[in-house]
């Protein structure tokens, strides 16, 4: 789930499901489950638009944004350790 949160933190705008799927490389089922968990935890906001076909966008909630500095530290550490 850290990969989803980190990607969303680095993208200020709302992100559509398929964009996330392409960028992060998860299966649709896995991504759907993780987004649902993040939404239930209040870390990600989900907005459904009344359009055909249906459009759903995700973005970090205010609560999720507070994780930004922590995520940056974790991913910086991972880069240092793996280099």
Regions found by a protein language model. Give the residues of each.
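Canonical helix-turn-helix DNA-binding module
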Residues: 17-49, 53
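Basic, amphipathic "hinge/linker" alpha-helix immediately C-terminal to the N-terminal HTH DNA-binding motif
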Residues: 51-72
């Amino acid at each position: 789930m850290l990969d989803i949160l980190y990607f969303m933190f680095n993208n200020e705008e709302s992100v559509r499901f398929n964009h996330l799927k392409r960028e992060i490389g998860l299966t649709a089922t896995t991504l759907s489950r993780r987004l649902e968990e993040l939404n239930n935890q209040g870390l990600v906001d989900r907005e459904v638009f009344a359009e055909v076909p249906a459009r759903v966008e995700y973005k970090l909630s205010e609560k999720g944004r507070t994780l930004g500095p922590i995520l940056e530290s974790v991913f910086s550490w991972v880069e240092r350790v793996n280099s």
